[in-house]
């Protein structure tokens, strides 16, 4: 690929990613899906994969119901190109006002750093992978505990007594220097 062609492809991919993120910020599922290659749509979040238009639409629908004010704080300068991918470092913000993964509304606000990797087939978007700290999300929603805090240690003890007991036994066997 010539430098001019490569620059044009990069610009097209960047425009597609920004259009995609703006559609997500508008909670416009049809416009979000329209950024994917015809017949191909896939999103991957920690622990789950949505493959195909209907599954992807359902994943977005659940997010937009759970976090009706969800938005990505995108700085266009945070986009990075690598081969057939565009990588975006952003923050996602929102208020948990609807059910999410079986968790009823907590009314809590969340603000998480997120990295999204958009994979392309030529100029066509085929997959979006998002990476974020699920523990941080659960802590911000009020249902998780930082295991390094007193509350976190108590929660771990109460929720996982056998694991704590085994760890305590193992620690007694380790010779101390």
PLM segments and residue spans:
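C-terminal and inter-domain tail/linker signature
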Residues: 1-177
């Amino acid at each position: 690929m010539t430098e001019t062609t490569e620059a044009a492809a990069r610009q097209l991919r960047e425009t597609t990613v920004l259009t995609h993120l703006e559609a997500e910020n508008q909670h416009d599922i049809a416009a979000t899906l329209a950024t994917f290659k015809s017949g191909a749509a896939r999103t991957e979040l920690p622990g789950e994969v949505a493959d195909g238009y209907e599954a992807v639409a359902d994943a977005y629908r659940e997010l937009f119901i759970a976090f009706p004010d969800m938005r990505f704080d995108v700085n266009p300068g945070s986009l990075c190109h690598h081969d057939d991918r565009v990588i975006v470092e952003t923050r996602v913000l929102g208020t948990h006002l609807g059910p999410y993964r079986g968790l009823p509304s907590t009314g809590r606000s969340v603000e998480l750093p997120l990295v999204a990797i958009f994979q392309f087939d030529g100029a066509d978007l085929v997959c979006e992978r998002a990476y974020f700290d699920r523990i941080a999300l659960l802590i911000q929603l009020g249902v998780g505990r930082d295991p390094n805090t007193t509350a976190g240690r108590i929660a771990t003890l109460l929720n996982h007594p056998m694991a704590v007991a085994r760890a305590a036994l193992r620690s007694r066997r380790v010779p101390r220097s």
